[in-house]
Amino acid sequence: MAELYERFIALYPYPHERIRHGAPRAELNRRYFEHLYEGKNRGTTPIVVALDPTLLGTIENNVSLRTSTPVQDITADTVERYAHELITDQHHYLDQVGVEVAAHEAFRHLNESAYLQTYRRLMENGELGEDDIGTPLKAEYPFELTAGIINEKVKATDIDSAAELLIMDLPLRDVSGVFAYLPFGGWDSSPSPEAMLSIARYWFERDDAYPAVIASDFIEFYTPVPVTTRRDAEILAVEHTMVSSAMPVRVYRGFDKLVEALYGQHDWYLWWEQLPRRRSSLKRPKPA
């Protein structure tokens, strides 16, 4: 893992903090918040990177494909140039169509049937469910990053194969640009970096949702203003389903459970079942 870490920070020479394996989950939550609030004054955006060979390989492949640079020749300058080009192209696209249209086009491209049959109807006609969710607003879920839960459970014998958590401060004010600097996805059914830029920008403007974690097979967002109506929870649940079709069945045991999990939730978790090199055994603990 030492070689992996050295390669990563050579590509990303930005201030960062390493979270030790087995650290209490509260430590990651606390330090992430501190980086987030400090970053607003410094013009930086923190992101928790769950570094493992698969994530780094995905990033390198995405950068290599767009820049026509062999993986072994990718440098920090290559990554920065890639990110700036992606962000510039995204800004031009948003100037033409707007943030909402760009996100909706990304949703539709990812899952056209869900977009046409469910999402558009929900946006136009109201709620899918008949009854309001009964959770009182004062019973909001506490903020807790799944990456911290996984890291807390890492045993000494598993350290060599476990992802290492880094809180990295990227030179960004536009938080959606995280997906340009760390181009997650583009394999199997996972969104491309370009799609995630559009979706993340939409979620930030509408929901004040910050990208919080990028791992090889999942991402997390943090929002200080969780959804508090059934309609908003259903809209968000359909959006999450379009981004990751495995979420309702493989993680939350049905769409209604996903709706309930997002209601009052400060942490959004999106997970993909397939990986380009291996299948992951790490999934979010299922709610009771």
Predicted regions and their residues:
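A broad, low-specificity signal marking well-ordered, structured residues that form hydrophobic/aromatic
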Residues: I47, L165, F179, I219, ...
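Generic detection of long, well-ordered alpha-helical segments
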Residues: G22-A26, S190-P193, R230
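Short beta-strand
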Residues: Y210-A215
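Short amphipathic beta-strand starts and helix->beta connectors
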Residues: Y202-A209
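Short acidic, S/G/P-rich loop/turn micro-motifs used as interaction or catalytic elements
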Residues: L56, G186-S190, V227-T228, R277
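Surface-exposed, low-hydrophobicity interaction/linker segments
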Residues: A156-Y202
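Alpha-helical oligomerization segments
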Residues: E194-L197, D217-A288
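Extended, low-hydrophobicity segments enriched in charged/polar residues
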Residues: M1-S176
